[in-house]
Structures are given as structure tokens and as C-alpha cells.
Amino acid sequence: MDLPIRFFSTPSGARIAYATIGEGPPLVWCPKWISHLERLWAHSAFRSFMRTLAGRHTVVLYDRYGCGLSDRDRTDCSPAADVAVLEALVDHLELARFALVGVSASGPHTIAYAARHPQRVTHIKRQ
């Protein structure tokens, strides 16, 4: 099964790559410092883990702005810019409440998002 990659645009006009797999309560998997959805999905261990999560959740994966299949013209690398992309993604997907997983460098902006929007975050997990 190929990962069904889609794109959306943030309010600032950045084109962001994302994918959703599975069914159930939403879980947003925030990317590491560098991400590439197609290359991640090519790794059997990652793919197997995501499929396991997708057995119980709608898993949302995305490439950071500036990485992978997302636009590469990023100039603002602040955590606030990452929060803005996360806000735009969950708004685009119309997710009212969801769990957040912050992997590596995405930890700070997942925490910042949860602090700003506690009514939307059901759980937060940092790796």
C-alpha cells in the first residue's frame, strides 16, 4: 500500500505534504527536524509501526515546511512557525480533538500547540 500523500496550503501560502491512514480517534504525528514522507514510508519498520497505530487511530503524518515534499522556501525556522503549520493542518483537516506525538525536534512546537489549544489536544506524547 502506497501512502496517500495530499497537499494543503497554509494561510501564508506554503504548500505542505501530508497523509492520513487508518480509522479512529485522530493522532497527529509531528515530524522530526528533517522529514520526507515517501522516504519514511519506504522503511518497513516505520511503515509497520504506522500501520499498527492506524489500526486504532486516524494517523496524520506530514512533512515539515522546508523538508521532503513540502515547499522548500522556508525562511522562518522558529518553533512559532512550526506551530502555525500544525494549526493550519489540523484546521484544514477539521480535527476538533486529537492526540499529538512530538518526535525529536518537534517536541517544542507540540508542547507550544497544546499550551495554546488545550481544548483540542486529548493526549501528548514526546519521543
How would you describe each model-predicted region?
Residues 96-127:
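Conserved hydrolase catalytic core segment
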Residues 54-57, 93-95, 117:
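A structural signal for short coil/turn segments at secondary-structure junctions
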Residues 80-98:
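Conserved acidic catalytic loop of the alpha/beta-hydrolase fold
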Residues 45, 49, 82-86, 101, ...:
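Generic hydrophobic, aliphatic-rich segments that mediate packing or membrane embedding
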Residues 1-7:
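Short, hydrophobic/aromatic-rich segments at coil-to-beta transitions
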Residues 71-83:
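Catalytic nucleophile-loop/oxyanion-hole region of alpha/beta-hydrolase
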Residues 7-71:
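Conserved HGGG/HGGXW glycine-rich cap/lid loop of the alpha/beta-hydrolase fold
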